[in-house]
Amino acid sequence: MSDSTLKPISIERVVTELKRLSEGRKSGQYAEDEYEHRFARMVGELRDRRIDGNRADIMTAFEGLRRDGFLDPGAWERLTKSLGLGPGRI
């Protein structure tokens, strides 16, 4: 039988994909509904596969994306809550 465990996704890959998604939305490449669909699919995949890193490293990377304008407040909240990284989570 094959191993059904999915390999975790690197923090660098997550950052790259979130930047690409944000740039596509800002440039008009993705309509709002297409962006929402892709964002939700990405979050689902991250929940299934996990991110390869500890909470501090992941949050540092996400904070950089927020600071640089790649994650708006709504996307930030959805991403961190969906991945269990919101305030008060361990």
List the predicted regions and their residue ranges.
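Acidic, Ser/Pro/Thr-rich low-complexity regulatory regions
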Residues: 1-90
